[in-house]
Curated annotation (Swiss-Prot):
The modification Phosphothreonine is found at T458. GO terms for molecular function: bile acid binding; bile acid nuclear receptor activity; chenodeoxycholic acid binding; DNA-binding transcription activator activity, RNA polymerase II-specific; DNA-binding transcription factor activity; nuclear receptor activity; nuclear retinoid X receptor binding; RNA polymerase II cis-regulatory region sequence-specific DNA binding. GO terms for cellular component: chromatin; cytosol; euchromatin; nuclear speck; receptor complex. This is Bile acid receptor. Disruption phenotype: Elevated serum bile acid, cholesterol, and triglycerides, increased hepatic cholesterol and triglycerides, and a proatherogenic serum lipoprotein profile. Reduced bile acid pools and reduced fecal bile acid excretion. Ligand-activated transcription factor. Receptor for bile acids (BAs) such as chenodeoxycholic acid (CDCA), lithocholic acid, deoxycholic acid (DCA) and allocholic acid (ACA). Plays a essential role in BA homeostasis through the regulation of genes involved in BA synthesis, conjugation and enterohepatic circulation. Also regulates lipid and glucose homeostasis and is involved in innate immune response. Keywords: Acetylation, Activator, DNA-binding, Immunity, Inflammatory response, Innate immunity, Isopeptide bond, Metal-binding, Methylation, Nucleus, Phosphoprotein, Receptor, Repressor, Transcription, Transcription regulation, Tumor suppressor, Ubl conjugation, Zinc, Zinc-finger. A zinc finger (NR C4-type) spans 138-158, 174-198. Acetylated by EP300. Lys-228 as is the major acetylation site for EP300; the dynamicly regulated acetylation inhibits heterodimerization with RXRA and transactivation activity. Deacetylated by SIRT1. Elevated acetylation levels are found in metabolic disease states (mouse models of obesity and type II diabetes). Methylation may increase transactivation of target genes. Expressed in liver and kidney. Expressed in pancreatic beta cells and macrophages. Expressed in the villus epithelium in adult ileum, with highest expression in the intervillus regions. Expression in colon is reduced by inflammation. Residues 264-488 form the NR LBD domain. The modification N6-methyllysine is found at K221. Belongs to the nuclear hormone receptor family. NR1 subfamily.
Length: 488
């Protein structure tokens, strides 16, 4: 198949060979302007053609294209008599063509990433984020620490032990009643006490998301820790009340400055929110499943239409992400297809928790359970929605998380991971500051948000299994879903 992206000038066509999957859908009760396109097959466009893309440059040279809502509200299943009749070109070529945006329409301001030198650096796994210098000791066992792993300063041994324990959901039993004093010797003798000490010292399962806790963030964490230690030491040494007061005032001012967005970060956030808010699901799709009760087959068709709208929203939002169209076109496709499932579930979680009228969440769950989808997949889906709801996320956090999901540098088939990471890092920095601003009493809120992204990754597997069962039962999908999910 060929995915066709078009811009303001000449369309660009790219073959899609990457395999992905999915579906987990919740309607959104907002109406939008209809668009005119989607991903479909096309006869032309060799993969090896010269795409004439500009090389990656920092955000001060990245255009912020004008955002226009382009979501279709029409139905693919019009021939079944279940939906209103729509024009035949509803899924014609061109709706989902990504095109280069002219630089003159873009935002020319600088962000923090533009101040960083564009140099090569080694890739870091999430667990090894934040290398350190000196002879710091592991807070768990006292061995020499290698860096900040899962939110705590630990050695390589405790990092690996914590990762294995969480991944395998391991349950250990202490022979001494849980009273072991953890050190380099005892860490090999008592796993229960070692895991408990890991958690007591701040290690978080939520941080096990590849690429999100970057070296920059860990440096910021150490900087804040050093400033706090310095402030405490100065306060203890000073007997003068006036000097104590000046120190406290200075420290307070520093902390306040660190939790305010810079002008460039605010501009970036405003742009992301403008793009995010202009992509909404047609209201009539919501009304279908909430106002009437249908057969399992009809419910499945409605859910398929919802999924199609979600993918349309994803493509339009992705096209507008700052810097996205400076990436290699094959990387653009890999990011889009790789994030389709996770972005859909994340948007659905927002709708489920914030957009549905009172009492409709339970009704929606009931209708989806009657669509023929196995409870094996539905139960974790709604558990995820509810766990996200418990975090009391703002719309800004939903929008930034969605952008972070899309710009994940560890997707399969990505050729230039460093370029993708450079686009993702400013979004992570903004999200981290917002967490401190909105929930200052909860210092772990940022880590909890990243933990939801870890949970999202599991839905790729669930969705692949769902697709397999649907294909066995000969369920049909729209051309866009077949393209984005690689359904033959």
């Amino acid at each position: 198949m060929v995915m066709q992206f078009q811009g303001l000038e000449n369309p660009i066509q790219i073959s899609l060979h990457h395999s992905h999957r999915l579906s987990g859908f919740v309607p959104e009760g907002m109406s939008v302007k209809p668009a005119k396109g989607m991903l479909t097959e096309h006869a032309a466009g060799p993969l090896g053609q010269n795409l004439d893309l500009e090389s990656y440059s920092p955000y001060n040279n990245v255009p912020f294209p004008q955002v226009q809502p382009q979501i279709s509200s029409s139905s693919y299943y019009s021939n079944l008599g279940f939906y209103p009749q729509q024009p035949e070109d509803w899924y014609s070529p061109g709706i989902y063509e990504l095109r280069r945006m002219p630089a003159e329409t873009g935002y020319q301001g600088e962000t923090e990433v533009s101040e960083m030198p564009v140099t090569k650096k080694p890739r870091m796994a999430a667990a090894s984020a934040g290398r350190i210098k000196g002879d710091e000791l592991c807070v768990v066992c006292g061995d020499r620490a290698s860096g900040y792993h899962y939110n705590a300063l630990t050695c390589e041994g405790c990092k690996g032990f914590f990762r294995r324990s969480i991944t395998k959901n391991a349950v250990y039993k202490c022979k001494n009643g849980g009273n072991c004093v953890m050190d380099m010797y005892m860490r090999r003798k008592c796993q229960e006490c070692r895991l408990r000490k890991c958690k007591e010292m701040g290690m978080l399962a939520e941080c096990m998301y590849t690429g999100l806790l970057t070296e920059i963030q860990c440096k910021s964490k150490r900087l804040r820790k050093n400033v706090k230690q310095h402030a405490d030491q100065t306060a203890n040494e000073d007997d003068s009340e006036g000097r104590d007061l000046r120190q406290v005032t200075s420290t307070t001012k520093f902390c306040r400055e660190k939790t305010e967005l810079t002008a460039d970060q605010q501009t970036l956030l405003d742009y992301i929110m403008d793009s995010y808010n202009k992509q909404r699901m047609p209201q009539e799709i919501t009304n279908k499943i909430l106002k009437e009760e249908f057969s399992a087959e009809e419910n499945f068709l409605i859910l398929t239409e919802m999924a199609t709208s979600h993918v349309q929203i994803l493509v339009e939002f992705t096209k507008k992400l700052p810097g996205f169209q400076t990436l290699d076109h094959e990387d653009q496709i890999a990011l889009l297809k790789g994030s389709a499932v996770e972005a859909m579930f994340l948007r659905s979680a927002e709708i489920f928790n914030k957009k549905l009228p009172a009492g409709h969440a339970d009704l929606l769950e009931e209708r989806i359970r009657k669509s023929g989808i196995s409870d094996e997949y539905i139960t974790p889906m709604f558990s995820f929605y509810k766990s996200v709801g418990e975090l009391k996320m703002t719309q800004e956090e939903y929008a930034l998380l969605t952008a972070i999901v899309i710009l994940s540098p560890d997707r399969q088939y990505i050729k230039d991971r460093e370029a993708v990471e450079k686009l993702q890092e400013p979004l992570l920095d903004v999200l981290q500051k917002l967490c401190k601003m909105y929930q200052p009493e909860n210092p772990q809120h940022f880590a909890c948000l990243l933990g939801r992204l870890t949970e999202l990754r599991t839905f790729n597997h669930h969705h692949a299994e769902m697709l397999m069962s649907w294909r066995v039962n000969d369920h049909k999908f729209t051309p866009l879903l077949c393209e984005i999910w690689d359904v033959q």
